[in-house]
């Protein structure tokens, strides 16, 4: 069933280290290329056909180009996207879905996008495609564009492939793997386990070794032009000062004492030793301990760092781009403002505050909340693909962050804006008199204040001991654990260098900046938090509540 479906569709920390490769110019074409029309040209021609634009407006677009207009072509993003096919992991995740939507909406002549999915059979994979992507509200602009042919278009372009990043050859059946390897131009590594306190064995298998398995598959792809991997800006571990856009290599900016096989052995021994709930608890603790031992905050950033190092060591001559976003939150503009899937890093705290569950937290109000909207991350990735997808074997890192600019978002400002919005527009109909959140500089002060809040609000006093009830203790432990997990971010003071990212923006034409813009300097943080992100977050929360 799987083979028939897919085959049928195929026919329709040295901190100041440097990258080992530089960017080389493309060789000039020695033939007369067919003329490709920009989005502006297409739109004006269409408007003229329907009587909305004058003939002169169209003819002005097709007059011979001057030297100045030639230089305005920018990177050539739309030209690069035409006819390209992709293999995407993590396709049903928050970031990947936004990226897929953008590719489908902006590239009229896109090839196929193969989506690696864990499913028991092709029917289940097709159902996941429909339930999690095709029917998602995120794709409503595409639905408007294609009308009644929307589903047919999506099923023609999006091909679910049964596989698993934790298996050799990605767990794809050989005949399907062979077919895909003949078609794809770009691999987009977007999958991963994002829980900060994940069990160590799972985080190692997916985040550390998964990219290597994907890279090995890519080396067998005949016309692969680029391997693009999404990492995290916090991948460099505990740092102060400026975090540069440099590759991670074991023996250079990752200690040579780190032995991946030894870490896997430790995790395997823990799995054999513990069972049930004890197993999960011990494996989470092991991940935290190993990350701390090597200088990382948690098992997520630690295993993502190993994953980057694996890519760097195994890449060979394959062109590689690493995208390192900071805290990805809801869309700024596209496909519409405020779209979010699930809750991101700061959101559980905001929602708990909105529901009146907490009015205190542990943080430094001056710490940098390095937030970046998801649509800007997608746009940057597309621009980087076009820039580096010419087959030149270079290794480029891009920090997609906001703290390097003059107006970074700080924790205190985020709290102030959240209080302002939630007082004016409460989360639910129940009126809660929200106090301004009190920020504590010590964990002890936060724990004491939260304990008093729980006693006061829920009246869960143990009659015998005068302390918290079992329910109250669980609530206290949950929020204290959350505060500890977020401590590296709520007390973050380093700034991320984004020289490479700035250079990429400068190479883009004006039209490319309008269509694929990701200049963080243009973000109005007050507008984004109050009018975009919080309304989007509330909408997501209420929609999830209805389905529960």
Swiss-Prot record:
User: What GO cellular-component annotations does this UniProt entry give?
Assistant: chloroplast
Molecular function as annotated in GO: alcohol-forming long-chain fatty acyl-CoA reductase activity; alcohol-forming very long-chain fatty acyl-CoA reductase activity
Primary location recorded for the protein, binned into one broad class: plastid
The EC designation for this entry is: 1.2.1.84
Q: In which tissues is it expressed?
A: Highly expressed in stems. Also present in flowers, leaves, siliques, pollen and roots.
Which taxonomic lineage is given here? Eukaryota, Viridiplantae, Streptophyta, Embryophyta, Tracheophyta
Descriptive protein name: Fatty acyl-CoA reductase 6, chloroplastic
- Changes seen on gene knockout: No discernible phenotypic alteration in the growth and development.
Question: What positions constitute the catalytic site?
Answer: 300, 304
Is Transit peptide among this UniProt entry's keywords? yes
Can you tell which superkingdom this protein's organism belongs to? Eukaryota
């Amino acid at each position: 069933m799987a083979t028939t479906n897919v085959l049928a569709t195929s026919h329709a920390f040295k901190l100041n280290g440097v990258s080992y490769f530089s960017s080389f110019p493309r060789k000039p074409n020695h033939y007369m290329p067919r003329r490709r029309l920009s989005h502006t040209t297409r739109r004006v021609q269409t408007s003229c056909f329907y009587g909305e634009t004058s003939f002169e407006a169209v003819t002005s677009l097709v007059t011979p180009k001057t030297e100045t207009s030639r230089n305005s072509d920018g990177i050539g993003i739309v030209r690069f996207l035409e006819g390209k096919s992709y293999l995407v992991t993590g396709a049903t995740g928050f970031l990947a879905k936004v990226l897929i939507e953008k590719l489908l909406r902006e590239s009229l002549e896109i090839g196929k996008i193969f989506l690696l999915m864990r499913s028991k059979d092709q029917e289940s994979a097709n159902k996941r495609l429909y339930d999690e992507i095709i029917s998602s509200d995120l794709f409503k602009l595409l639905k408007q564009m294609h009308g009644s042919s929307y589903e047919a278009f999506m099923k023609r372009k999006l091909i679910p492939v049964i596989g698993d990043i934790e298996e050799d050859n990605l767990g794809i059946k050989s005949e399907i793997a062979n077919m895909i390897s003949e078609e794809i131009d770009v691999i987009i590594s977007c999958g991963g386990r994002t829980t900060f306190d994940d069990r160590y064995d799972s985080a190692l298998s997916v985040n550390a070794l998964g990219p290597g398995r994907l890279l090995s598959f890519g080396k067998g792809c005949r016309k692969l032009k680029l391997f693009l991997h999404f990492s995290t800006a916090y991948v460099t571990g505990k740092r102060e000062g400026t975090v540069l856009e440099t590759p991670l290599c074991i023996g250079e900016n990752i200690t040579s004492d780190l032995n991946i096989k030894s870490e896997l052995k430790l995790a395997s021994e823990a799995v054999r030793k513990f069972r049930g709930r004890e197993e999960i608890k011990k494996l989470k603790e092991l991940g935290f301990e190993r990350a701390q031992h090597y200088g990382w905050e948690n098992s997520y950033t630690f295993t993502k760092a190993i994953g980057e190092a694996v890519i760097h060591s195994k890449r060979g001559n394959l062109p590689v781009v690493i995208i390192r976003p900071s805290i990805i939150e809801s869309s700024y503009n596209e496909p519409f403002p405020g779209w979010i899937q699930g809750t991101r890093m700061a959101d559980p705290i905001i929602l708990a505050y909105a529901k009146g569950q907490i009015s205190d937290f542990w943080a430094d109000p001056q710490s940098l909340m390095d937030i970046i909207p998801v649509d800007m991350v997608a746009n940057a990735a597309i621009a980087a693909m076009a820039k580096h997808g010419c087959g030149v074997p270079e290794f480029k890192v891009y920090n997609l962050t906001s703290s390097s600019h003059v107006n970074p978002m700080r924790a205190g400002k985020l709290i102030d804006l959240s209080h302002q919005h939630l007082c004016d527009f409460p989360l639910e109909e129940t009126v809660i008199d929200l106090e301004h959140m009190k920020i504590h500089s010590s964990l002890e002060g936060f724990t004491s204040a939260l304990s008093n809040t729980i006693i006061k609000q829920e009246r869960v006093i143990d009659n015998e001991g005068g302390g918290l009830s079992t329910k109250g203790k669980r609530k206290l432990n949950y929020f204290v654990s959350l505060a500890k997990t977020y401590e590296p971010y709520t007390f973050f003071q380093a700034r991320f260098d984004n020289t490479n990212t700035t250079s990429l923006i400068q190479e883009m034409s004006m039209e490319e900046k309008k269509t694929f813009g990701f200049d963080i300097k243009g973000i109005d943080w007050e507008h984004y938090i109050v009018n975009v992100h919080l309304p989007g977050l509330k909408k997501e929360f209420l929609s999830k509540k209805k389905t529960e």
